[in-house]
Amino acid sequence: QPGLLPSRQLEQKSPEGPPPHELVVRIVERTPIGSIQSSAGYTLVDAAGVALSTTPEPPPGHPVIDAAGGVGSDAFDAVGTVFRSLPADIRAQVTDMTATTANDVTLTLGGTGTEVVWGNADDSAYKAVVLAKAMTARPPDGVSSYDVSSPNAVVMR
């Protein structure tokens, strides 16, 4: 692939050269899901765990991830699946994502400190819809936690 420089910021790049004089380049940028704290600072990562950048402070607009086993673990994969399933307006409120196993993902909504108990990543799209409806019915400023781990029986405290 001459002419295309390697970059960790790109997930895919594929040049296509349909004849006779056209060149099409398709590029897919990596999308960060959050940052992981280490002795070097906060490393912004995508869902595959690819490091995109490191800064001394948490990057604004990206939650801090604490997944047991780090990138490549089942806990990290579950956090990534959950985060990507959230609608943009809820995603923007998430400041922390934790998981000690793939079955206990928990989110924190920064403006209020409200905890979202997610459980495992199964049915994440459905859980995201249930969470959005619960947040509309009872906004986070009046709730200490939402439990959508059993999405057919959401619990708000």
Question: How would you describe each model-predicted region?
Answer:
Residues 2-157:
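Charged, solvent-exposed interaction patches on well-folded alpha/beta domains
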